[in-house]
Amino acid sequence: VDDRKGYCMDGVYSEPRQIGWDNYVSDLLALMPHYRLMKESLAIGISGNWGSGKTSFLKSMQKQMNADYRVVTFNPWTCTDKEQIISQFFALMREQTENNEESLHEAIQKYQDIVLDADIHPAITFLAKILPLSKKEETLDSLKDKIEEAITIDGSKPFAIFIDDLDRLEGNELFEVLRLIRITANFRNVVFVVAYDRDYICNVLNESKNIKRAEEYIQKIFHLEVSLPKFEDDTLLDVFMDETVRIASLNERQAARLQQLVMQLFNVDGLSFTDFVPNFRQARRFANVFALNLKSILAHTKDFVVKDFIGVELLHFAYPEIHRTLMYKPMILLKLNKGGLSKSGLLVYEGKDNTPSDKLLRKLFYSNNETQLTSREVRSQLSYANYFCYRLPNNSIGVTEFEMLMIADDLDVVRDGVNVWMRRKDSFDSLYEHFRSYYMHGYKDIKVIRNYICALLEFIPQLSDKGIEQIISDRYWIRGGVDVDELRKQLISLFEYSISKGKFLEKINHLLASFYNAYPDDYE
């Protein structure tokens, strides 16, 4: 079974990412000479916020320590109570003893039994340290000496106890693990490396154990506390890209194009990927949902722009309330800006704030620079819903569908296509909006103009006079570079064909009356 396929978990699937921490880890390990560890126990705290890379840092340490240490990975958050924490910890220590270390194995087991018995009967804790429970039994201190003697003989590798996600624990369990580090398992030649969120630990100790000076308490536990070094912002983008490429099975060309589009969102206005995805865990979580949604929309429609989709999904992930508003009540945030060469209704964001979400909204919903691509952008009413449904909504006619009809060579194909759409239930509004807002390839292609008028003449029976005016008004058909005589010839032929049918003559006449306009003198 290939665990690299499918969704991404917090664990690192391959070698730990090169993020500039290896040298730092080497310097840290240099502070731990073995001759010093033979004399004392050492506890190192790795402090960082949720998702900041603590697990990756621990893995980097483990990789460098595997050869020279007896590495133990202890997950206390899998235990249900403090007795299980103690039992599981010492069981892991015993597993790291050699087969010929039977006396050490036995001493660890006895030590564990006394510790557990002392926890059940607290009154005997002190006596257990100095007095045997029977003539044949050893004291806690004597067993500790025996264990330390066995694990510090010449050539013995130190124990390296790795504890990740200490901040998963609640009050009693957390306190028990800290006591384990500081007192119960405070053996010479043992190194504890513990990852945690300091703020969380302090709050839990304060609330559950009434430890008011929790920071000082933590300082007594850990001899050295490391705050993770800063890494380059691009590192998180690389994590996101690697996981997205893996989950979505993108090829090299697709991956390069996706990264280029992501970077286009963040090359101006001071926007950064880390404004939306601030840490490693979030980068992987975003990759999971983005890859899923990207595969879904790619499978169902071509009527979207990938760069816009990335922006909408970033809002979805980092600002879910804003995304919810865009999905269900868009006009709270946006306004409809009618006009422009395409006559399309563009959704525009006019907020002036400089938060990351405001900057991204302005990049997605702007009012200028209309192109042939505009009808597929999120700011276009024609395609807006696609970005939230991950498909073409029911009864909608896709931009690509309409475009293919506008560039068809055969007029019968155009007429048949429009009539198929007209027979679709509840498709009138979608078809009307396509006619009203179509960009017309800049009015420079005679075939596109011909097909548009041909299709409109088929659709005209369903239109009111006002609808005809809204579609045709402010369209300027004649421009430089167009063969006017050829255009006139083809359009006259289309009108003659429709008139010959003898139906809807008044509407055709209304269309003709609105049709011929030259560019106004001040048009640029």
Regions found by a protein language model. Give the residues of each.
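The feature marks long, low-complexity, polar/acidic/proline-rich intrinsically disordered regions embedded
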Residues: 1-40, 44, 52, 58-72, ...
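P-loop (Walker A) phosphate-binding loop of NTP-binding proteins
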Residues: 49
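Short glycine-rich substrate-engagement loop in P-loop NTPases that contacts/grips substrate
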Residues: 82-86, 127-148
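Structural recognition of the conserved hydrophobic beta-strand(s) that form the central parallel beta-sheet
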Residues: 160-162, 191-196
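A short beta-strand-to-loop transition that corresponds to the Sensor-1 phosphate-sensing loop
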Residues: 195-199, 204-208
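Conserved ATPase-coupling elements of RecA-like P-loop NTPase cores
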Residues: 169-177, 205
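A short helix-turn-beta junction within AAA+ P-loop NTPase domains corresponding to the substrate/partner-engaging
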Residues: 208-229
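Conserved P-loop NTPase "ATPase switch" module shared by AAA+ and STAND
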Residues: 154-171
